[in-house]
């Protein structure tokens, strides 16, 4: 793979790439000089595309003449066309060619100056001067295109046109009509200029990385790209090219080749800004302006950032969190075991300094606010600043009372008064914890996928200079969380940049920490370390059996649970540069205010030296010297041992001395090696032995050093090169990714700097493991070769190189994130094993060489895995064994490396290799063949505790000896993601970019420009690049990774493929899926090196038509996982998964680490402590299963796949007739909404994905195509329906499969619409379902029961099946209308006499509708109706214990909507059927529960227009059981689907639904109360009722076939009524509400909600009712954040509509908002005012609006404007003074929350509300009236003369309406009901206070109103009086929800349609009486609307029933 990081130097001779026709050989442009840049030597490609151009004389084009351009002004698909008849055959169609605009002045300049050029441009006359201006560079452009001949018709039309160029190309590249251009073929003489990086921006869409890859391949690859180019992919994905780079230089255009790296930046992302409120935030800026630090943030940086955003018009979502760590001074020493320190109140205890306990605080100031509202953001920030410090400093005074161990309040207060709280300094703050919590926000971004935003960016603003002291564990956790996702972290530092490398994490080396459990839980195990937070019991470098002897601080304390004296602190510090954090410094001076410092000292361009004037003295050198922070005290003097001629041999020892401990506790360890410098390395300065001879007869040390001094006085003329250039690249491969198993701290001792340990000496690579370069004299290397070879033969062919000092500070090696464990005082080799068996065998052979293992042998045997020691070997024990104790034989220590105690060998080994290991410590400069070990042990004679403080200054920790362990040491585990450095003296040429930037490397076109960072990353975050160059070394790869292979082949029967996928297509899908999961393709030569090959056959992922052959591979990596996809066996793909081994210490760390911060969310009134599991393991994915899914072996989306998912609901809106052009006259709101769902269902059915194997079959039976959705509509909630109607529900498993028994007649006997007998048709229709008839049954709608009716959609399906000449449902509907009784028939007699021509077969139950294919109820006309079987109406008289089944009930009917089981009452406390009902369905065979599935799933094609290159199929889940008053649920699941196509489909659904009064809203999949588990910075807001509801509740009635009252209401009746009052709609029911005897599930899983969840009609607010009756409120950010919503909000603001106010819901008066219909946002309101409609009336607080919708009243005719007639107190208001409330287009969730909360806190309002609900109880049914009816008195008022409303009661009649006795009711008797607008809205778009406002001409409508919704006592008394005055006539009410338990007394209004309606009502009443009913029948209703009509009349026991 070619390099992705071009070198500035000339690579010399390179092999040309194997490209046909040389079409893609590129040369660098010569627009300006290319600066040198640091690069990874590994990444220089062997087929680099950068090369010198030949001289112009050698490449003169054959096209010497110039051609004339003609610009195509019209739309053109082809950007350039050539007339090949004129140009000739030298231009071959399909080849690449360059077109250059000819400029004579450029030619003259070029000819005069072309000899200055190192590289030449396209043609000899186009040579630009090297110093030309930018304008000239802009004008000098070339366009490369694929040659295509002009069509014949164009040639005929324009015969003289030579070059035909599209207008947009001509404009960009400076071509005009008649311009002269030259054409040049792209070949090896004239290669294309390949862009190194192309930057694209996009917004308002979610673009997965798979989409980015395909966009680059299909729209950019092998094309010219130019700045400003608009890219459109699949007709919907849009992006714009914002910059083109050639090797770091911006150019106007270049060629997108195979080595070009696309950078995708999102302008609609999510930003989380963390502001660290450390102590310094309140300090003054002493170095700069002198202002307070926080002011620099809110007055400097943030305004500048927000203004940048505004100028770029980006659409980000911003969350801002303030965080701080508060330290507590308890007033007494923690060492004394103060129980308060063990207090669970604290988050932890500081690991250094004063060891104070601390508490972490987080304050959410802004939560997901649009970036355009930045003024509000800054205001909230400034306001919070005033209180933040006070709140966190006093929090403990309240919070610690509950944690106090004392029961005496006085003692508690005294203890609290002693504690002082203070914010910690930034360096000790909770920096990593904040980042870790931020990453948890997006750990599950595949759930509730936001389809409008791409990218996540976390910005941390800190007063720190860029260095943080962190715990290793926190660093490990954060790194693990970040390396696998696409989150970028930017650090903005407020102070000036320091002089050391940044960003820097300072952490204690975990190898020295011996505390076995987590810091604030370590109450039992003794600690051997002063690091309270380290959980790995690893062994310290100077630990004895008794404890630790490493340096400690005087202020160190012992954590609670530790015993004092258990050990002294091991202050061993490492300094790490993370690859996932990028730092900037706010200077506040200019647009260049963010000076990017990052790793400036490490990789800055050394050639650009700064002038002396730039240097500012900013530190006190003396202090640095005293603290040993500098590299050396003698700044200019190099350490002696770095000189190649220094006599290192003199500094060697021969034996292994025996250590001993004196009575003072000092450990005396005899030198293994004589000190190699002139002063003692032992910090006690107690003993100095310079005269020890390494061997007998050798010169004394003094003599050798004297000779050296003399030789140095005679300076040689030639010095050996310490860094031979030929080996630099070899170093990089070995060190760059292995960065040292060994490493040192901020190591400053010059004794560490030996030539062989410097980076320049490292020549070992994965495939040159036997070579070492030695800077010493040649003979020294040769002299040692034999010994090494002997050792190597026993041990391993590979040797791990010694890593240079600066790399030791940050270990990237095999032991990961912490420094490799210190080892015994023995000469130990660090060997990387290539073969596990050989390494283990050889190590054990060495170990068993002697009877007692030497320390060296023990050290060799030591590994990162569980440790095994030979018996008798003294070991360091992390559990504090006594001195001299021996470990048991073969003792295992799980988790951490151990270090054998350096003891004197009991026998001298005779084996040379063993002697080499145990006998002496050789300088690595003398013997480069192996690596030195712990230097301090080698040099020390004794270590005194008081001197130990200095030990960390010159630690040098050697690498571990891997034995291919099953686990990795902590240092190795995270090595690729950190770079250890000495921050004060990093080697500027040693840090490799590929390692330093790792997966983000290819985002930086200019990696050398590190001093200044533009605003780009803060304004438009980049997605994780598609490619990376990082790959482990061969040794790492073989020793640290497990391999899991499997093969995948395409399933030939894959139903989701049009035809079987080719292997290339399957490979592309597998790559796409991995891109979506965060993988990157590994490019560059590192892969080949890791496999020990010079070259690998690697697939080119950016090739458009590349065909993968057998043997080709592609490597993809993410985190610690590498996938190799290889083509094998012709059709198969072999997958090798390489997974890094787990961390060795995992068992010893507290894996369930609970982090306990105090968080205050946006709406909280105070801080609340909560525990978070920071180590929640992410389960490994089963990639075999995933790839099997891609290959088509299974198509079910299971949780193993981690598929993307989103949930949507359709919320019923209050509709206006002006917005329903598609509906027919007379539809109610409810009917319109059901029609909208039917339209959506038709759309889904039309575009459902049909497998290719079924298409021919589907085409042949198109007319047989039944509606697969088969949605069952009920007017009760699902739990109620399941409890009451279980046995007849078609959703019951077992009923669905055979619910249609096929056609009644064979094809020969089918009817024909041209000629059929009406009587025969009627007979066939009324056959039992099993005989082919249509399902006839009693059907309830709201309060009305319709007998023996069928549904329009069922009839449509039946007609299609039984008529041979019907082709589709439209024709069937047309035929059904011919069979209808016409509307002009006035009576059934007329129908009987007048309809003999094929009509008059059936009629709408209310005669309101013609025949429709939908949820409409029809009955067979009396002429053709079969007589009802005996006992048809007897079902309510059947004993309740035996559910009865009417004759019409057939189990395989598609619509069994009436249950014959006993009536039930729903109560959420218990099962709805508990104690009273045992459904017959529960008696299934085998005792299994009956199973009901409430939703279905279908495969839906989101690309029905076939724009994509692949099938785009999602799983669409939809409700099967729906109550039109509730939300309709839709859920989408997908894998490997273009998200933008899904978004387009959803927007189309939203537009369609909005036309029918439905709002499509995205809602969270999980319920609101669980939000904190996903997002720790959000918490539901709890609203408590000021007055608890009374225990007395109304009675709930429910029975599907009768009105027998039941005695138990639903739970939380008042709370549900309250939410509905505030316009909330039921979303999801809790799992507990379903009967326990029924197995209820959805197509996506089991119901799992704990509480009942509602959603506001605006879609912006979610509410839940808890078990205690409290209300939880949560903003629905998924919906309110949509960009469409923001656009509409802007439109509304421009329109000037008022926001809120006016009524108690914040809905102010004013004009209705104008909104675009169907927009997919919270403002997508279906209501639009016109000239005739008044503003939409919204229910006020007096009424329960949603549950009391007048679903029977549709937008029939416009009436005069009116108001609701009631105020917020429930009292009637004067119409002249009432302002009509308007439902605004936008309702902020905060406004709704405030209104709801204010009402809930108002005791008087709540009591009045409860009273209104209970007043129904005060009016029991009057004995002298129809049972179940309360006396109702309704005042009469004058109505309009033309009112034609038909009522079922005399005093509610009007016009020509008659009662059952035939009396005419005069218009003047029509009373004024004063009904709420929730009932009377949408009749002409008006609210009505007077029935005269209803203009219902010639149609029967039903109006049912529950008194629960009527808030006026006066209305109730009036209704009672009216009822008492006419006891003989029944009134009928719409039923309320059963769960609400609405009482039985109802006001019923039946509006009939003329005299016939009254007659029908009378007939129904008579029929009911004849059937034995105690009272008359139901008020007539439409199937959808519940309106009254032809079947109305008296209501006996029915009248009191409640219905929803």
Curated annotation (Swiss-Prot):
<dbReference type="InterPro" id="IPR048255">
    <property type="entry name" value="IML1_N"/>
</dbReference>
<feature type="region of interest" description="Disordered">
    <location>
        <begin position="742"/>
        <end position="783"/>
    </location>
</feature>
<feature type="compositionally biased region" description="Basic and acidic residues">
    <location>
        <begin position="128"/>
        <end position="137"/>
    </location>
</feature>
<feature type="compositionally biased region" description="Basic residues">
    <location>
        <begin position="113"/>
        <end position="127"/>
    </location>
</feature>
<dbReference type="GO" id="GO:0010508">
    <property type="term" value="P:positive regulation of autophagy"/>
</dbReference>
<feature type="region of interest" description="Disordered">
    <location>
        <begin position="513"/>
        <end position="534"/>
    </location>
</feature>
<feature type="domain" description="DEP">
    <location>
        <begin position="1330"/>
        <end position="1422"/>
    </location>
</feature>
<dbReference type="GO" id="GO:0005774">
    <property type="term" value="C:vacuolar membrane"/>
</dbReference>
<feature type="compositionally biased region" description="Polar residues">
    <location>
        <begin position="1760"/>
        <end position="1775"/>
    </location>
</feature>
<feature type="region of interest" description="Disordered">
    <location>
        <begin position="107"/>
        <end position="139"/>
    </location>
</feature>
<dbReference type="GO" id="GO:0035556">
    <property type="term" value="P:intracellular signal transduction"/>
</dbReference>
<feature type="region of interest" description="Disordered">
    <location>
        <begin position="1"/>
        <end position="64"/>
    </location>
</feature>
<keyword id="KW-0926">Vacuole</keyword>
<feature type="region of interest" description="Disordered">
    <location>
        <begin position="1042"/>
        <end position="1061"/>
    </location>
</feature>
<dbReference type="Pfam" id="PF12257">
    <property type="entry name" value="IML1"/>
</dbReference>
<feature type="compositionally biased region" description="Basic and acidic residues">
    <location>
        <begin position="1383"/>
        <end position="1398"/>
    </location>
</feature>
<dbReference type="GO" id="GO:0005096">
    <property type="term" value="F:GTPase activator activity"/>
</dbReference>
<dbReference type="InterPro" id="IPR027244">
    <property type="entry name" value="IML1"/>
</dbReference>
<feature type="region of interest" description="Disordered">
    <location>
        <begin position="1684"/>
        <end position="1732"/>
    </location>
</feature>
<feature type="region of interest" description="Disordered">
    <location>
        <begin position="1374"/>
        <end position="1401"/>
    </location>
</feature>
<dbReference type="InterPro" id="IPR036390">
    <property type="entry name" value="WH_DNA-bd_sf"/>
</dbReference>
<feature type="region of interest" description="Disordered">
    <location>
        <begin position="1977"/>
        <end position="2004"/>
    </location>
</feature>
<feature type="compositionally biased region" description="Polar residues">
    <location>
        <begin position="1455"/>
        <end position="1464"/>
    </location>
</feature>
<dbReference type="GO" id="GO:1990130">
    <property type="term" value="C:GATOR1 complex"/>
</dbReference>
<feature type="compositionally biased region" description="Basic and acidic residues">
    <location>
        <begin position="774"/>
        <end position="783"/>
    </location>
</feature>
<keyword id="KW-0472">Membrane</keyword>
<feature type="region of interest" description="Disordered">
    <location>
        <begin position="1441"/>
        <end position="1482"/>
    </location>
</feature>
<feature type="compositionally biased region" description="Polar residues">
    <location>
        <begin position="746"/>
        <end position="773"/>
    </location>
</feature>
<dbReference type="InterPro" id="IPR000591">
    <property type="entry name" value="DEP_dom"/>
</dbReference>
<feature type="region of interest" description="Disordered">
    <location>
        <begin position="1754"/>
        <end position="1775"/>
    </location>
</feature>
<dbReference type="Pfam" id="PF00610">
    <property type="entry name" value="DEP"/>
</dbReference>
<feature type="compositionally biased region" description="Gly residues">
    <location>
        <begin position="1694"/>
        <end position="1711"/>
    </location>
</feature>
<dbReference type="InterPro" id="IPR036388">
    <property type="entry name" value="WH-like_DNA-bd_sf"/>
</dbReference>
<feature type="compositionally biased region" description="Polar residues">
    <location>
        <begin position="18"/>
        <end position="29"/>
    </location>
</feature>
<dbReference type="InterPro" id="IPR045838">
    <property type="entry name" value="DEPDC5_CTD"/>
</dbReference>
<comment type="similarity">
    <text>Belongs to the IML1 family.</text>
</comment>
<protein>
    <recommendedName>
        <fullName>Vacuolar membrane-associated protein iml1</fullName>
    </recommendedName>
</protein>
<feature type="compositionally biased region" description="Gly residues">
    <location>
        <begin position="1986"/>
        <end position="2004"/>
    </location>
</feature>
<dbReference type="Pfam" id="PF19418">
    <property type="entry name" value="DEPDC5_CTD"/>
</dbReference>
<dbReference type="GO" id="GO:1904262">
    <property type="term" value="P:negative regulation of TORC1 signaling"/>
</dbReference>
């Amino acid at each position: 793979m070619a390099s992705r990081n071009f070198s500035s130097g000339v690579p010399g001779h390179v092999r040309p790439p194997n490209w046909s026709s040389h079409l893609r050989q590129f040369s660098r442009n010569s627009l300006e000089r290319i600066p040198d840049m640091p690069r990874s030597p590994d990444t220089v490609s062997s087929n680099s595309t950068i090369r010198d151009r030949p001289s112009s004389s050698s490449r003169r084009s054959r096209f010497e003449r110039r051609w004339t351009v003609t610009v195509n002004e019209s739309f053109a698909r082809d950007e350039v066309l050539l007339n090949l008849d004129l140009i000739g055959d030298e231009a071959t169609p399909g080849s690449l060619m360059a077109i250059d605009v000819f400029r004579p002045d450029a030619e003259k300049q070029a000819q005069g100056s072309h000899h200055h050029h190192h590289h030449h441009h396209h043609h000899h006359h186009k040579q630009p001067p090297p110093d030309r201006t930018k304008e000239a560079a802009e004008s000098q452009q070339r366009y490369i295109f694929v040659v295509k001949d002009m069509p014949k018709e164009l040639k005929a039309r324009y015969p003289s046109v030579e070059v035909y160029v599209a207008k947009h190309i001509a404009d960009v590249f400076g071509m005009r009509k008649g311009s002269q251009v030259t054409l040049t073929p792209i070949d090896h003489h004239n290669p294309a200029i390949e862009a190194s990086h192309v930057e694209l921006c996009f917004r308002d869409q979610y673009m997965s990385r798979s989409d980015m890859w395909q966009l680059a391949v299909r729209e950019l690859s092998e094309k010219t790209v130019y700045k400003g180019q608009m890219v459109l992919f699949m007709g919907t994905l849009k992006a714009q090219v914002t910059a083109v780079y050639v090797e770091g230089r911006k150019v106007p255009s270049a060629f997108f080749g195979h080595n070009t790296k696309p950078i995708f930046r999102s302008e609609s992302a999510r930003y989380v800004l963390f502001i660290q409120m450390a102590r310094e935030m309140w300090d003054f800026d002493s170095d700069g302006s002198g202002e307070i630090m926080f002011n620099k943030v809110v007055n400097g940086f943030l305004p500048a950032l927000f203004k940048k955003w505004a100028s770029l018009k980006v659409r980000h979502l911003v969350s801002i969190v303030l965080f701080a760590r508060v330290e507590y001074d308890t007033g007494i020493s923690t060492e004394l075991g103060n129980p308060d320190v063990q207090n669970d109140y604290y988050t932890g205890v500081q690991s250094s300094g004063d060891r104070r306990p601390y508490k972490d605080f987080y304050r959410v100031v802004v939560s997901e606010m649009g970036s355009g509202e930045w003024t509000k953001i800054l205001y909230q920030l400034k306001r919070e600043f005033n209180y933040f410090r006070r709140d966190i400093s006093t929090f403990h005074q309240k919070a610690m009372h509950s944690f106090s161990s004392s029961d005496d309040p006085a003692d508690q207060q005294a203890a609290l008064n002693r504690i002082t709280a203070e914010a910690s300094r930034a360096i000790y703050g909770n920096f990593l914890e904040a980042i870790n919590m931020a990453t948890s926000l997006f750990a599950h971004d595949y759930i509730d996928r936001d389809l409008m935003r791409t990218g996540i960016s976390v910005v941390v603003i800190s007063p720190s200079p860029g260095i943080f002291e962190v715990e290793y564990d926190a660093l490990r956790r954060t790194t693990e969380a970040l390396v696998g996702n696409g989150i970028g972290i930017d650090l903005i530092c407020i102070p000036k940049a320091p002089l050391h490398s940044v960003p820097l994490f300072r952490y204690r080396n975990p190898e020295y920490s011996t505390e076995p459990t987590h810091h604030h839980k370590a109450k039992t195990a003794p600690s051997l370390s002063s690091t309270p937070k380290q959980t790995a019991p690893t062994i310290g470098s100077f630990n004895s059996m008794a404890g630790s002897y490493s340096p400690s601080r005087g202020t160190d304390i012992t954590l609670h649970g530790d015993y004092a004296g258990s050990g002294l602190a091991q202050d061993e510090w490492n300094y790490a540069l993370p690859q996932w954090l990028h730092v900037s410094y706010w200077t506040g001076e200019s647009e260049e205010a963010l000076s990017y410092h990052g790793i400036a000292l490490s990789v800055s361009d050394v050639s650009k030296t700064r002038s002396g004037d730039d240097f500012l003295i900013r530190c006190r050198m003396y202090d640095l010297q005293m603290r040993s922070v500098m590299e050396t005290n003698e700044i200019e003097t190099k350490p002696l041992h770095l000189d190649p001629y220094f006599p290192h041999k003199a500094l060697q020892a021969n034996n292994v001395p025996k250590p001993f401990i004196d009575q003072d506790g000092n450990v005396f360890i005899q030198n293994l090696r004589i000190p190699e410098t002139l002063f003692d390395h032992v910090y006690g300065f107690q003993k100095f032995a310079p005269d020890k001879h390494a061997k007998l007869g050798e010169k004394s040390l003094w003599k050798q050093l004297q000779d050296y001094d003399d030789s140095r006085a005679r300076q040689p003329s030639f010095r050996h090169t310490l860094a031979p250039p030929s080996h630099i690249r070899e170093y990089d491969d070995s060190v760059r990714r292995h960065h040292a198993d060994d490493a040192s701290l901020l190591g400053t001792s010059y004794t560490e700097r030996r030539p062989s340990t410097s980076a320049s000496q490292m020549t070992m690579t994965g495939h040159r493991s036997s070579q070492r370069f030695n800077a010493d004299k040649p003979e020294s290397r040769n002299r040692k070769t034999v010994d090494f070879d002997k050792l190597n033969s026993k041990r391993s062919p590979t040797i791990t190189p010694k890593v240079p000092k600066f790399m030791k500070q940050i270990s990237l090696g095999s032991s990961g994130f912490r420094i490799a464990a210190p080892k015994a005082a023995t000469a130990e080799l660090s060997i990387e094993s290539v073969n596990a068996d050989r390494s283990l065998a050889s190590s054990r052979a060495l170990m068993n060489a002697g009877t007692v293992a030497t320390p060296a042998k023990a050290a060799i045997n030591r590994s990162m895995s569980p440790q095994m020691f030979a018996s008798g070997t003294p070991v360091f024990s992390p559990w504090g064994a006594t001195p001299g104790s021996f470990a048991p034989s073969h003792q295992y220590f799980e988790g951490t490396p151990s270090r054998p105690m350096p003891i004197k060998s009991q026998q001298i080994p005779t084996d040379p290799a063993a002697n080499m290991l145990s006998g002496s410590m050789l300088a690595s400069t003398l013997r480069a063949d192996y690596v030195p070990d712990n230097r301090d042990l080698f040099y020390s004679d004794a270590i005194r505790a008081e001197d130990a403080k200095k030990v960390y200054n010159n630690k040098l920790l050697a690498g571990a000896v891997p034995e291919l362990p099953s686990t990795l040491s902590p240092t190795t585990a995270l090595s690729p993601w950190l770079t250890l450095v000495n921050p004060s003296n990093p080697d500027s040429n040693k840090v490799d970019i590929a390692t330093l930037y790792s997966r983000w490397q290819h985002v930086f076109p200019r990696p050398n420009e590190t001093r200044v960072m533009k605003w780009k990353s803060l304004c438009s975050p980049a997605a994780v690049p598609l490619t990376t160059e990082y790959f482990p070394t061969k040794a790492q790869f073989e020793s640290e990774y497990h391999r899991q292979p499997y093969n995948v082949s395409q399933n030939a029967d894959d139903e989701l493929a049009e035809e079987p996928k080719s292997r290339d297509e399957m490979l592309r899908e597998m790559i796409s899926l991995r891109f979506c999961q965060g993988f990157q393709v590994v490019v560059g030569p590192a892969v080949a090196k890791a496999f020990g090959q010079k070259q690998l056959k690697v697939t080119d992922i950016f090739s458009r038509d590349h065909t993968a052959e057998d043997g080709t591979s592609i490597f993809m990596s993410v985190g610690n996982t590498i996938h190799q996809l290889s083509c094998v066996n012709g059709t198969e793909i072999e997958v090798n998964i390489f997974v890094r081994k787990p961390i060795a210490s995992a068992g010893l760390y507290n894996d369930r680490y609970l982090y306990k911060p105090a968080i205050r969310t946006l709406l909280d009134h105070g801080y609340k402590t909560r525990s978070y599991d920071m180590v929640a393991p992410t389960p490994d994915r089963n990639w075999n299963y995933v790839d099997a899914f891609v290959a088509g072996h299974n198509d079910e989306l299971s949780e193993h796949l981690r598929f993307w998912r989103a949930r949507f609901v359709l919320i019923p809106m209050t509709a206006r007739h002006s917005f329903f052009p598609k509906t027919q006259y007379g539809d109610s709101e409810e009917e319109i909404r059901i029609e909208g769902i039917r339209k959506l269902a038709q759309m889904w059915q039309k575009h459902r994905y049909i497998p290719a194997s079924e298409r021919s079959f589907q085409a042949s039976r198109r007319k047989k195509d039944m509606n697969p959705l088969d949605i069952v509509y009920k007017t009760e909630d699902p739990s109620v329906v399941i409890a009451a109607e279980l046995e007849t529900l078609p959703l019951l498993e077992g009923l669905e499969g055979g619910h249609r028994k096929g056609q009644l007649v064979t094809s020969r006997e089918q009817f024909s619409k041209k000629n059929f007998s009406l009587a025969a048709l009627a007979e066939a229709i009324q056959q039992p379902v099993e005989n082919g008839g249509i399902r006839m049954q009693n059907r309830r709608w709201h309060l009305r029961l319709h007998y023996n009716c069928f549904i329009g959609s069922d009839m449509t399906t039946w007609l299609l099946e039984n008529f041979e000449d019907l082709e589709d449902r439209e024709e069937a509907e047309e035929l059904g209308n011919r069979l209808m009784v016409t509307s002009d028939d006035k009576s059934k007699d007329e129908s009987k006499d007048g309809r003999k021509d094929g009509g008059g077969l059936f009629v709408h139950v209310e005669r309101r509708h013609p025949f429709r294919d939908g949820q409409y109820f029809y009955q067979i006309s009396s002429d053709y109706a079969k007589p009802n079987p005996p006992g048809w109406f007897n079902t309510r008289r059947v004993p309740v214990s035996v559910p009865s089944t009417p004759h019409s009930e057939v189990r395989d009917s598609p619509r069994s909507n009436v249950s014959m089981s006993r009536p039930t009452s729903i109560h959420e406390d218990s099962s709805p059927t508990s104690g009273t009902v045992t459904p017959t369905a529960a008696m299934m065979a085998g005792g299994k529960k009956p199973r009901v599935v409430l939703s279905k799933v279908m495969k839906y094609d989101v690309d029905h227009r076939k724009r994509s290159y692949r099938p785009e199929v999602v799983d669409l889940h939809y409700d099967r059981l729906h109550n039109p008053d509730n939300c309709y649920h839709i859920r989408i699941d997908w894998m490997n689907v273009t998200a933008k196509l899904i978004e387009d489909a959803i927007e189309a659904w939203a537009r369609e639904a909005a036309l029918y009064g439905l709002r499509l809203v995205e809602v969270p999949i999980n319920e609101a109360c669980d939000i904190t588990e996903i997002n720790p910075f959000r918490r539901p807001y709890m609203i408590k009722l000021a007055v608890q509801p009374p225990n007395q509740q109304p009675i709930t009635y429910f029975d599907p076939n009768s009105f027998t009252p039941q005695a138990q209401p639903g739970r939380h009746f008042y709370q549900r009524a309250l939410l509905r009052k505030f316009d909330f709609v039921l979303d999801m029911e809790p799992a507990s509400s379903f009967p326990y005897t029924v197995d209820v599930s959805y197509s996506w899983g089991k119901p799992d909600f704990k509480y009942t969840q509602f959603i506001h009609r605006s879609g912006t607010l979610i509410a839940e009712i808890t078990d205690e009756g409290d209300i939880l409120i949560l903003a629905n950010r998924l919906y309110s954040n949509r960009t469409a919503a923001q656009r509409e909000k802007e439109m509304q603001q421009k329109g000037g509509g008022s926001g809120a106010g006016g009524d108690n819901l914040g809905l102010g008066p004013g004009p209705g908002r104008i909104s675009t219909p169907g927009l997919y946002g919270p403002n997508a309101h279906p209501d639009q005012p016109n000239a005739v409609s008044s503003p939409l009336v919204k229910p006020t607080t007096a009424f329960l609006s949603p549950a009391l919708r007048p679903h029977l009243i549709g937008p029939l005719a416009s009436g005069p404007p009116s108001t609701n007639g009631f105020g917020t107190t429930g009292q009637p208001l004067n119409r002249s003074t009432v302002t009509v409330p308007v439902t605004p287009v936008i309702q902020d969730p905060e406004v709704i929350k405030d209104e709801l909360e204010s009402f809930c806190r108002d005791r008087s309002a709540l009591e009045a509300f409860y009273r209104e609900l209970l007043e129904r109880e005060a009016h029991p049914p009057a004995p002298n009236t129809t049972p179940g009816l309360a006396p109702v008195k309704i005042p009469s008022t004058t109505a309009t003369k033309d009112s034609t409303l038909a009522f079922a009661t005399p005093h509610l009649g009007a016009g020509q309406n008659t009662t059952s006795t035939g009396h005419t009711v005069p218009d003047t008797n029509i009373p004024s009901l004063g009904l709420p607008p929730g009932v009377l809205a949408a009749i002409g778009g008006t609210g009505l206070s007077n029935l005269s406002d209803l203009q219902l001409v010639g149609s029967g409508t039903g109006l049912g109103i529950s008194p629960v919704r009527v808030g006026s006592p006066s209305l109730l008394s009036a209704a009672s009086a009216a009822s008492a005055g006419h006891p003989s006539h029944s009134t009928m009410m719409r039923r309320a929800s059963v769960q609400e338990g609405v009482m039985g007394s109802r006001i019923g209004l039946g509006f009939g349609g003329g005299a016939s309606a009254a007659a029908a009502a009378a007939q129904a009443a008579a029929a009911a009486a004849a059937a034995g009913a105690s009272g008359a029948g139901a008020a007539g209703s439409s199937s959808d609307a519940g309106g009254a009509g032809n079947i109305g009349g008296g209501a006996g026991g029915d009248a009191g029933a409640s219905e929803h």
